[in-house]
Amino acid sequence: MLQPKRTKFRKVMTGRNRGLAKGTEVSFGEFGLKAVGRGRLTARQIEAARRAMTRHIKRQGQIWIRVIPDKPSVQKPLEVRQGKGKGSAVYWVAQIQPGKVMYEMNGVPEELAREAFRLAARKLPVKTTFVTKQVM
C-alpha cells in the first residue's frame, strides 16, 4: 500500500478539506477518473480501486495513480480512556478536492476503460466522473 517513506512529523493536525484541486487535467494517459465531490481516500481504498481496474483490463494498457496518501490518520486503541495525548498513526489518507484526476489509463479501448473506472469508482467514497484527454 502507498505511504510516504519518511515524514518530517509523525502526526499532523486534522485541518479542513476546502478549496479546489490541483491536477485537474488528464496528463499522462488517455482516459481519467475525476473526483466530483470531496473526501478522504485511505491507502486501502486506493489499492482496492487499482486492483479492480487492473483485473478488469487483464493487465493490458497502463494505469497511473495520481493521488498519494501523505497524511497520517490517528486512532486510540479500544477501551482506552480519553486524554493522555493523541493516538498513534494507524493508516494514511489522501485528501481529495473536486476536480482532482485520481487515476489515468492508456492503451485500452474507451468502453473497456469506462467499465474499469466504473468498477474502481465503486470502491471509492467520493463521487467521480469519466474524463478523456483534451486534444488542442
Swiss-Prot record:
Keyword Hydrolase: no
CDD domains for this protein: Ribosomal_L16_L10e
One annotated GO biological process: translation
Tagged with keyword DNA-binding: no
Highest taxon, organism lineage: Bacteria
GO cellular component: cytosolic large ribosomal subunit
Pfam families referenced in this protein's UniProt entry, alphabetically: Ribosomal_L16
Record family assignment: Belongs to the universal ribosomal protein uL16 family.
Stated role: Binds 23S rRNA and is also seen to make contacts with the A and possibly P site tRNAs.
Name of this chain's protein: Large ribosomal subunit protein uL16
Annotated source species: Vibrio atlanticus (strain LGP32)
